[in-house]
Amino acid sequence: MTKTLPKDFIFGGATAAYQAEGATHTDGKGPVAWDKYLEDNYWYTAEPASDFYNRYPVDLKLSEEFGVNGIRISIAWSRIFPTGKGEVNPKGVEYYHNLFAECHKRHVEPFVTLHHFDTPEALHSNGDFLNRENIEHFVNYAELCFKEFSEVNYWTTFNEIGPIGDGQYLVGKFPPGIQYDLAKVFQSHHNMMVSHARAVKLFKDSGYSGEIGVVHALPTKYPFDANNPDDVRAAELEDIIHNKFILDATYLGKYSDKTMEGVNHILEVNGGELDLREEDFVALDAAKDLNDFLGINYYMSDWMQAFDGETEIIHNGKGEKGSSKYQIKGVGRRKAPVDVPKTDWDWIIFPQGLYDQIMRVKADYPNYKKIYITENGLGYKDEFVDNTVYDDGRIDYVKKHLEVISDAISDGTNVKGYFMWSLMDVFSWSNGYEKRYGLFYVDFETQERYPKKSAYWYKKVAETQVIE
C-alpha cells in the first residue's frame, strides 16, 4: 500500500554553518576549535566547504525549484561574537539577516540552530560546556539572537548534545579529542541541557514570537539477544548514555531514578563523578513543558551485547567497511545481526528504529508536543556521471524512513516535517569530503551544484505527499 504524509508536512533540507559556509576567517569571524583540530588531525579542513557563505542564493533557488520548503541553518556563534562574548561583530549579524531574507524570498522556512558543534575557540579552550561560565555566555548569545533576528520563526538551541559529549570525551574524534571519560560525557550533556533550559525559559519569559525546541540525535538501542537479560541491560545502559539522560532532562526536568541508577553504575565501573546542582534542576524543571518541538536526528540503530572487558572504540572515518569497534567496560559492545545492512562507514540501515524511537518519545515523554525529523539521510561515495548522481540507494533509504514516519503519524504521533541531511553536499566532521549526503551534488573545485536523481524524486514526493 502506498503511504502518504500530511498536506502541511515540511519537506526540508539540513545544513550546518561550519560544514557548509566555508569563509572561516571572513568578515571578522572568530576561530573555532575545529580550525586547528582538522589541520592537525585530519586530511581536510572547513575550506572551502560548500561556500554557502557566498552561494546561499544558489542553494535557496534550487530549494524553491525542487520543492524544499524548509531549511535547517545554524548561526556560527563566532560570527556574532568572535570570542564567544563581548563585542558583537556587525558583519556577522548582517550576513544572517541577508540569509534569512533570501530564505523568505524563496519560500523556504528557516529552522535556525544556535549551536551546531562550533563553540568559539576562546570558550572551547576554556573548558567548553564543562565550564559553567560558558553556560552564561551561551545564554547571552541566545538572547542577542532572539532580539536581533525577529524574522526567525523556529529556533533550536543545540544540535545533538549527545554526539558532542560522545565525540569530545568518549570516542575522541571531536576536539579536544579525549577518550573514554564518561564522567565528562555526562557532565557535558548535563551542562548543555541546563544551557538549553535557560535559553528556552528566557525566550518564553521575554515573549518572543515563534517556536523553540532542541535537536537530539536518538539512535535506537536494541539487545543483541532479547532473551538474554545481560544484553537487555547493555542496551539500557547504552541508551542512557546516548538518549535517555538527555531526554529526561528535556521533558522530565530531572533524571529518573532508573536513569541515575544506570549513570551511577557506569561511573562506578569507569570512574569519575558528576556535579549536579539544585539550581540546575530548578532550571530544567522550569523549561520541561516549554519546548514547542523536538527535533530527532536519526541515521542508525545499534545492537548491544554485555561486555566487561577493556574499553576500546575505533572510529571508521574513511569508509573501510568493518573497521569500526565499540565496546565500553560495564556497558556493552555493539554487535549487529548479520542480516542488517550497513554503509561503508559501518552505519546500520534500519528504518524500523526511527519508528520505534518516535513511539518511545510519545510513550515516555507525553509532553513532547510535536516532532520534526531534523536529520536523516545516507552518506555515500557518490559517482558523478552525466552531470548528476544516480543515487537509487539514497532514494530507497529516504523512502523507507518516510514510510515509517507515515506509520508513526497513523499511530497517533505528531510528526510535522522531515529534513534530509543534507540539502547540498557538505563536508563531514570526521569523514571529510568523500562522504556525501546532499540532494545537490557539489563539485568542491568549482562549487557548481548539480541536482542528483534523489532531488527529482524528493521534489515529486514534496509536491504530492505520496511516498512512491
UniProtKB/Swiss-Prot annotation:
Its EC number is 3.2.1.85. It comes from Streptococcus pyogenes serotype M6 (strain ATCC BAA-946 / MGAS10394). The lineage of its organism: Bacteria, Bacillati, Bacillota, Bacilli, Lactobacillales. The active site is at E160, E375. Belongs to the glycosyl hydrolase 1 family. This is 6-phospho-beta-galactosidase. One of its GO terms (cellular component) is cytosol. GO terms for molecular function: 6-phospho-beta-galactosidase activity; beta-glucosidase activity. It catalyses: a 6-phospho-beta-D-galactoside + H2O = D-galactose 6-phosphate + an alcohol. The keyword Flavoprotein does not apply. Keywords: Glycosidase, Hydrolase. Transmembrane segments: none annotated. It is an enzyme of class 3 (hydrolase). Pathway: Carbohydrate metabolism; lactose degradation; D-galactose 6-phosphate and beta-D-glucose from lactose 6-phosphate: step 1/1. D-galactose 6-phosphate binds at Q19, H116, N159, E160, N297, S428, W429, K435, Y437. GO terms for biological process: lactose catabolic process via tagatose-6-phosphate.
